[in-house]
Amino acid sequence: VMGQVLYRIQENYPDVHYLLFDDEPHNDDYSAYKTANLVHYVLFQEEQAGYLAGYAAVTEGYTALGFVGTREVPGIVRYATGFLQGAEAAAEQQGERVSLQTWFADTDTVNEAITQRMIDWYNNGTSLIMVSGGNLYEGVSDAVNQTGGKAITTDYDNTELGDRVLGSAIKCYNAAVQRQLYTFFAAGTWNGQTGGQTEKAGFTNGEVALVAGAPWRFDSFTQDDYRTLYEDLRTSVLKMDADSDLDTLPENIANDIADNKERNRI
């Protein structure tokens, strides 16, 4: 929504500077994009946070995985593709094979039908579900409490929902906002390298992470393992793809979701 608003007003106030997160200025149907020089926008690399979660889940022993998103939009799809890539990397190390069901509910608000779908997945063998978008975390919290399954959420730290929510693949808004404001006030404006430009926030500046409660809720995937994995990804010792389309994943990864992908809507 903010991207649409900014698209319309960004040139109306020539003395106002804008900082936009998680979106870019676009028209209502996403057919046109335009960013004025007084606008700087930041897109998180959700696939990186998703990778951490997928790697942790499989290292912990969960190989029958699910992913439920509100809508099939780039940010949520990046969480899904990163989640699968991390799961694949951990499974390859351990000689395991993972399966992933994906489903996009086409709504931002959880309802009984969505919660029941997750309950059915758990009852049919899915061991861990990652949810992304809206308030799906409320639905998965109900589902794990009824079935004994496990979950990982996204965006914010939702581990207070209970021990069955093993962790959250988060965007570190506080760190990202502080860094951007420091850059702005140091120059007094968005300069030529920032004004009208897109910036990606991720491993490089520590602006995505996996949080897993206090005390740490993973057993096999230790905090030392997490720190090592994070550093290997930050320094590009390990590589990953920034896919925002499930249909363009590398073939070996796409094969694991080909038979399980759902795009039904409730």
Regions from the PLM with identified roles:
Residues 1-266:
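A residue-level marker of the well-folded mature domains of exported/periplasmic proteins
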